[in-house]
């Protein structure tokens, strides 16, 4: 049996719409991600378990794990009866790269089972293709960091598509999932089709400034450049609590940045000192979570990405 773990991720990181993403892991050692296992069987089957198993479509044709297996069989021209198990631990439509977790874990497991027919570049392209079947458009800001780990920028027009961006070791990422769904399709539909020239200039300056600051180890400049002028002004209305209010409160408590994780409704809060983390986490649990499905996790950068695990 082959078993693969794929971690949750924060797409966009405020400043890099459809371009930046980072893989995350809870600092307490918990697993925030999906597991997929595959083994020989007489007949094909998919079994679902995990904290959010009930959010997975019942019909096989709608299951992204099945779609990954079917597409891989088409590419490899091989069809083998297998048993695939998905342990779904990242909520669907949460802004934490839930579909990417399932896609990455599935394709890494399937590719390994088939003798690694595809290299990493080919796998990544296939992951982006499968992500497009879920969200309605091909993008890599979740699948790339989920697969390869770290903070990454995706350059779709060039051969070396996924590039690692150095982060800061003292950065702590608090993520707060309120327990409600916001689909990627819906969150993309609220975005304008065109942006002003000034918005384009500002976006380019923020993103290039952030990348430059990360490479030159200018932490303050990097923090100052985490500004979302592309998605946040339009997606903030989809959140259950006013984002400006949240940002103001967490910054008063010592956070250095706050924004929407991916398409939302999860938000991220960035801290660069440890002594403010507990207070901010407790406050978010009280004022942002909407039901018992919501959670707050204190995370750090996951540098490994997907991994073949034992058991």
Swiss-Prot record:
Transmembrane segments: none
Pfam family, one: GHMP_kinases_C
Annotated metabolic or biological route of this protein: Amino-acid biosynthesis; L-threonine biosynthesis; L-threonine from L-aspartate: step 4/5
GO molecular function: ATP binding; homoserine kinase activity
A GO BP entry: threonine biosynthetic process
Binding positions for ATP per the UniProt entry: 91-101
Localization of this protein: Cytoplasm
GO cellular component, one term: cytoplasm
Keyword Secreted: no
Keyword tags: Amino-acid biosynthesis, ATP-binding, Cytoplasm, Kinase, Nucleotide-binding, Threonine biosynthesis, Transferase
Family annotation (PANTHER family): HOMOSERINE KINASE, HOMOSERINE/4-DIPHOSPHOCYTIDYL-2-C-METHYL-D-ERYTHRITOL KINASE
NCBIfam families documented for this protein: PRK01212.1-4, thrB
This protein's name: Homoserine kinase
Lineage: Bacteria, Pseudomonadati, Pseudomonadota, Gammaproteobacteria, Enterobacterales
Gene: thrB
